[in-house]
Design a protein with these regions (language model features):
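Individual transmembrane alpha-helix segments
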Residues: 17, 278-309
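Glycine-rich ThDP/TPP pyrophosphate-binding loop and its adjacent helix/strand module
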Residues: 156, 174-231
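Short, charged juxtamembrane terminal tails flanking transmembrane helices
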Residues: 317-322
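Short helix-perturbing small/polar motifs within transmembrane alpha-helices
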Residues: 129-168, 172
Length: 322
């Protein structure tokens, strides 16, 4: 069964919901998600220490910055809904699974702490369904295609990006059902249906990014030949910053999860953040204006890029010292 939203079925909210907010999941499910996420992150840190070259640190920062900027732009999907880039497949393919997961985690944590996008209690769940699950799905398919022709690899990466969104949506539906928030029989087809469309956008963006890298800086796709120099770092950050200029044009329609919550009647269970710093990607003293959104995006891009690169360098230095 496919649930297709119709215009006017659900009002656009003042606070667009891009990630799972507090209140959607039970405490028990949230704790389980935290335990799983922390266990996987512990493995990721250990493996990242063993495997990645320090020259990958700035690449991780640039990738995190681009994904953050990309996630700010919701694109319209079907009458009255929107979607946005997750970016996990892109991060895992370019950085490898371990450093890729750390980059995705940095993005998701910063979004929750600074921009109040995603709950604090359910942060572990957001890392699980936006970082771990989609990244492993997309990267798993990519591993199968390694060594094959460029065309096959590109097609498989696109398919993996699409599938990663659908699987992440299904896992989210399971978490909602097990939390008692809504019925599994309703949540699964509703989440899967709309995210099959959102996944097309994910696939197109991921393939475009990979193709651009392959044409302009192919060494980035070969982690054993990590590129050096500062020109590509400046260029990568410039692209991320340019993307933020388009953030005011993002679709105001609710994203897939928010639409499902409205249709299924549990949208009101979402809890507001206990504090606000740059809520909903705006600077409070500038209000909900285009300039406010752009400046908030610039702050986020620079912070997440710098933090991710710093974490990567710190991991490598600890390895060298041990």
């Amino acid at each position: 069964m496919f649930f297709a939203p119709m215009p006017g079925d659900m009002p656009v909210t003042d606070n667009p919901m891009l990630h799972i907010p507090d209140g959607f999941l039970s405490i028990a499910i949230s704790v389980v998600c935290w335990l799983v996420t922390l266990a996987v992150l512990a493995v990721a840190v250990r493996r990242a220490r063993e495997e990645f070259d320090e020259r990958l640190a700035p690449l991780a920062g640039v990738m995190a910055a681009f994904i953050f900027a990309g996630q700010m732009i919701n694109f319209p999907v079907a009458g009255g809904t929107s979607g946005h880039l997750i970016g996990a497949t892109l991060a895992f393919v370019v950085l490898g699974p371990w450093l890729g997961l750390l980059a995705m985690t940095a993005v998701i944590v910063l979004q929750a702490l600074l921009f109040q996008d995603g709950g604090l209690v359910v942060m572990g769940a957001n890392v699980l369904v936006m970082g771990i699950v989609p990244g492993l799905v997309g990267y798993g398919l990519y591993l199968w295609a390694r060594g094959k022709s460029h065309g096959v690899q590109t097609a498989v990466i696109g398919a993996g990006a699409w599938l990663s969104v659908v699987v992440a949506a299904l896992i989210t539906a399971l978490l909602l059902g097990f939390s008692g928030t809504t019925s599994l029989a309703i949540a699964i087809p509703a989440m899967a249906g709309i995210h099959m469309l959102i996944g097309i956008g994910e696939a197109l963006i991921t393939v475009a990014a990979i193709s651009f890298i392959a044409q302009t800086r192919p060494a980035m796709l070969q982690r054993d030949k990590a590129t050096s120099g500062t020109g590509w770092i400046i260029g990568g950050l410039a692209i991320a910053l340019i993307v933020t200029l388009f953030s005011p044009l993002a679709s105001a329609f609710p994203d897939g999860l928010e639409w499902v919550a409205g249709e299924m009647g549990f949208l009101q269970t979402a809890q507001d953040a206990p504090y606000e710093i740059l809520p909903d990607y705006t600077l409070p003293f500038l209000g909900e204006t285009a300039v406010s959104t752009i400046l908030a995006g610039v702050i986020g891009v620079l912070l997440v890029g710098g933090i991710t690169a710093l974490v990567a360098r710190t991991i490598r230095r600890r390895t060298a010292a041990s």
